[in-house]
């Protein structure tokens, strides 16, 4: 009885201790001289400011933000709860964004600690629970999430994650129904913080469930846990259905996956932080010691969490990546992001281990606390007490962002490959004299994400005419370039200057690190464009980068286009195209060629015939061939070509040559045989080429190959589309945009969204919205409202029915 009273006293005392600790952490961060740190921090601060100002104007759920990415749905693709929490913090801070950040940090520290105190009480281990509460915020991986990654959404979920794991543990232990709503609700809150992270939590819990079944065999209880998570997702349907349409789901995350695996020793080495800083994820040597100790000496009830923690740790290694990358959905297995989930399970199992002697409990607690010490410097920083306003203003000046804001009339493109993290985009659009931007943070939410990727890729390749021309297409009257990128990619400042001048931009400012270009325009404007050629297929953008006068088509499928649409171009390129009906596609090409349109087909990516399983089109068959280190000499109609060697990493070159050309314009010799790779079929307006020359040219800029590619089409790499800047009047209302134009077929330079609807004709090309002459009123409506509401309603009904059935049983 006395022990129970002490536990209750502790339960009421610890929140005061945690509050004092949170206030101390806030003071340390404020005086650190480096806050707000973290690459993505200012993205979350920006979203909070966006919601805060929208609510002040009477809009409680703003659908659209015009400042980033040519217009973006800021609450659609990233979970909304962190934005509203940050907005609430900003309200408490009297409108200060920096104050909001400090309150957010303090809140995560305080609430994250409190939940562990209650969990300790639930396991009848109040003192250990109170200690873990103090420790949780300071766990190295949690500190890195806040102060290095700046992933405030995931940090917010650290409040709900332990409660969810606790509910899972308790339900599997005693199958009491009261833990089911707790599981559903806390999982729902975790998903509202970060949907992707909720998916990772679900995977980790399924791993835990498999281990639990092997140890104890209670399959039905584990199934109940899985159902609870599914219901959590369903209840979120009103937001989640819209979130899963486009945006994040349209991006390929397979390359990102590889970045979330590392060497095992790096993950557990406690001294790595002292020698290399915090560039790597840290699981914790102390946590590993607790795992091993728990597996060897613990009992079944607590051992499951320790085993699961070890499995997750092993799954973070590069060796595991070799296996995991072949699994379905593997692009979302960012295993190093699972560390905090594993730590939560380990600490929960530590709490459950009630038979462990007190001296050993104390030893493990000391070890866990000692392991956090090197990471505490992330909170303390330089402790120089330099004002955050001073630092931000100085950074704005040193990067020429303040100069760019002064001259920009419509939109700014910051070409720095996000070297400043989200801070750069925040400095452009939410600090000083804010202006709209083509770039931003949280690119997964941008409908113009492919445009942005293409700009960065073209800049790296030195295709500067494409860069400046497409910046004009995106409505950027100012372009700010990080100079070090030129050296990084072995590009020339002279070429950059020449390209900017050709498009119409002039250099207006530069310092040692940045150079600012600007073009004179009206205050608000659009673009009327005319392209001489169109490229269709997955490789279309490569052609456009090499020849900026070529427009990139929206669809790769040739059957999606009519003769009337394509006959207005002088040339049509097919590179990586697809079709549904081969005969119809061939007939379209023939009809275009007879009308005088030149059709250039890059044969390497001709679709495979469904019946013959061979690559053939218009009677020409592609035969595979492999070169090593370089091409052989090529005899062409412009003379003999001696291409450069293949670049490093591409020394084995798999490609095709052609059989069935009517007129041969290019051959090479292989093993004594003359093989065709370039010529015409049916008539001189249908040109085919093999050997994957376009890709080779994109890698090497080989002059002779470039001349050959130009000869095929007659287009020069110096040629630009015909563009005319025209004035527009753009007015924003509550979930409404009104555009007034004096011209037809005007690119508004605003990103097109599926939430747009209008009685006037609005169209989408290259992810941008086009309008015609007159006034166009565009309404914005919540996307997929009824579908999402039905999913949420179904979740509520299923949960109620399920609970009733289980209660009766």
PLM-predicted stretches and their roles:
Residues 2-3, 537-539, 718-809:
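Active-site-proximal, structured, solvent-exposed surfaces of multi-pass membrane proteins
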Residues 583-642:
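A glycine-rich, often tryptophan-bearing local segment used as a flexible ligand/cofactor-contacting loop or short
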